[in-house]
Amino acid sequence: MHFTRTLFNQVASKASRQLPVQKRVQMAYDLHIPNKTVNPNLNIRSHEPIVFVHGIFGSKKNYRFDCQKIANVTHTPVYTVDLRNHGQSIHALPFDYETLAQDVADFCEDHGLKKVNLIGYSLGAKICMLTMLQNPDLIRSGVIIDNSPIEQPHIEIFLQMFVKSMIHVLNSTKIEANDSDWKRKADDAMKRYIPDGGIRKYLLANLINKVPKGYKSPVIDYDDGFIHFQNPVKHMTEVAVKNVSAWPTEKVAGKTFEGPIRFIKGTKSAFIDDAGKKAIAGYFPNHSISEINATHFILNERPLEYVRVICDFIKTERFRSLQEHLRNVEHFSPSEIEAKQAAKHAQQIEELRKVTSTSESSIPHSTQSSEQAFTENIDLARQEREHQKSVSA
């Protein structure tokens, strides 16, 4: 009896705790390195990395296969992150767009990432848009999947249902961690609130019956013998609804991001409506929109299509950037411009060549792909052009 009361008191004490406030967190992440390119003679890996940010109650593991495909096709390292209160990242407040966007910017800074291509879905889409607006020099381009930079109070009822269904699984069923049928029982319990099997699968992907090695939560007792979500859902009933549907309009008033942005809209989704399109045009003048026949859950319903749109966009923008670099190099003539401009250009070229002179073996595995210099692409293109001229001659 004493043991039972002690255990109960420990569980109750932890459940009553509040999420700690932590301004800065180190997000858990996976790095997807591109395999050999389709052409064995072109072992090029861009130094403009991709960072993929998931949606509410998602995680870096949800789209690991998709992100590996993106890495392979674009020859680009892809970082997938776990936002705070998701996956293997820390459980902490605040949980608002300003804090989450700063988490992404801090992640890029901590890992030495520059000219980043951001990809964000749903909650992650808004986070990426805000990151671009607040850190334009850090971001090269972006792909925004089915969301708009506006307040969306109409989605709160769905967010409330998500939270309620997850808490119901924990409170009403009390499924033991060693129950061999725990996944089916959890799915059955969630049907009361979420009849759609695809959405249940998405939410239940966060459910675990044993804690990841070395992970601890300040508010969840993973060792109490029951199944748990990796998200502190009982402590997110407010922030996962009101804060997710919000948008910091006043904070970004007058701000724009001039880089290329591709929006992916689900034709059966209301997340990018007329008001959203108007806001998009105001914040992101250099944007385009692709439509995919899907609901808001595009990534689960049309994985091949959204991956194709992303890869085509990244490769197209890289080609345009390469052409611009080539024009700058070809038109460079020290005798025609001031000496100061010539010295500055030479310094930039030398810095790029220093990066490429570093051997792969001396670069840490987690960063070697993201530090490859863009001059490799320039040299390759020039060689190809010279070859074509010699053939035509």
Curated annotation (Swiss-Prot):
Reactions performed catalytically: ethanol + acetyl-CoA = ethyl acetate + CoA; acetyl-CoA + H2O = acetate + CoA + H(+); ethyl acetate + H2O = ethanol + acetate + H(+)
Q: What's its job?
A: Alcohol acetyltransferase that catalyzes the synthesis of ethyl acetate from ethanol and acetyl-CoA. Can also function as a thioesterase by hydrolyzing acetyl-CoA in the absence of ethanol, as well as esterase hydrolyzing ethyl acetate.
Q: Where is the active site?
A: 122 (charge relay system), 146 (charge relay system), 296 (charge relay system)
Q: Name the chain's protein.
A: Ethanol acetyltransferase 1
Q: Where is the composition biased (Polar residues)?
A: 355-375
Indicate the family of this protein. Answer: Belongs to the AB hydrolase superfamily.
**Location in the cell:** Mitochondrion
Q: Which UniProt keywords apply?
A: Hydrolase, Mitochondrion, Transferase, Transit peptide
Give every AB hydrolase-1 domain span.
49-151
Entry-linked SUPFAM superfamilies: alpha/beta-Hydrolases
Extent of the transit peptide: 1-25
Pfam families attached to this UniProt entry: Abhydrolase_1 (PF00561)
**UniProt-listed InterPro entries:** AB_hydrolase_1 (IPR000073), AB_hydrolase_fold (IPR029058)
Q: What is its EC number?
A: 2.3.1.268, 3.1.2.1, 3.1.1.-
**A GO molecular-function annotation:** acetyl-CoA hydrolase activity
Q: Write out the ranges of the annotated region (Disordered).
A: 343-393
Broad class of the protein's primary localization: mitochondrion
